[in-house]
């Protein structure tokens, strides 16, 4: 069986592990995009420390869970979004105003929608976490 969307698989694995009460989770295969999404989640306090482990194949991320994630998921298709449209997408994917983050891939890297609004840049929606 082939893995069609590694990011969606990683986020659902994190959500399921949180619900069961696990303290750490191993995500494979690892990629730069998954690493950047984990960095944004760590910055906002949704996960603890994470590290890349080279297993000779694609690699593995070991992630410490803090029990703060209610739901995390990938956004498919990757909708393009302008700075003025973030509020519309926030209403669609997040349960309440200013609760949770949308993760956006921009020309300046992967960041939350709050950072993108501050910098005044748009991008493509890739994930949500709350």
Curated annotation (Swiss-Prot):
Entries under InterPro entries matching the protein: Ribosomal_uS8, Ribosomal_uS8_CS, Ribosomal_uS8_sf
Single GO BP term: translation
GO CC annotation: ribonucleoprotein complex; ribosome
MF terms in GO: rRNA binding; structural constituent of ribosome
Keywords, in A-Z order: Ribonucleoprotein, Ribosomal protein, RNA-binding, rRNA-binding
KW Repeat (keyword) present: no
PROSITE patterns registered for this protein in UniProt: RIBOSOMAL_S8
Function as written in the Swiss-Prot or TrEMBL entry: One of the primary rRNA binding proteins, it binds directly to 16S rRNA central domain where it helps coordinate assembly of the platform of the 30S subunit.
Family to which this protein belongs: Belongs to the universal ribosomal protein uS8 family.
Subunit structure: Part of the 30S ribosomal subunit.
Protein name: Small ribosomal subunit protein uS8
Origin species: Pyrococcus furiosus (strain ATCC 43587 / DSM 3638 / JCM 8422 / Vc1)
């Amino acid at each position: 069986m082939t893995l069609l969307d590694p990011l969606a698989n990683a986020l659902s694995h994190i959500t399921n592990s949180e619900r069961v009460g696990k303290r750490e989770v191993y995500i494979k295969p690892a990629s730069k995009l998954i690493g950047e999404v984990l960095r944004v989640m760590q910055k906002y306090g949704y996960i603890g420390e994470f590290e890349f482990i080279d297993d000779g194949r694609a690699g593995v991320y070991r992630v410490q869970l803090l029990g703060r994630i209610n739901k995390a998921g990938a956004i498919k298709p990757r909708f393009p979004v302008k700075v003025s449209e973030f509020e519309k997408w926030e209403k669609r994917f997040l349960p309440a105003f200013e609760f949770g983050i949308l993760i956006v891939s921009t020309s300046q890297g992967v960041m939350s929608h709050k950072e993108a609004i501050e910098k005044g840049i748009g991008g493509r929606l890739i994930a949500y976490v709350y």
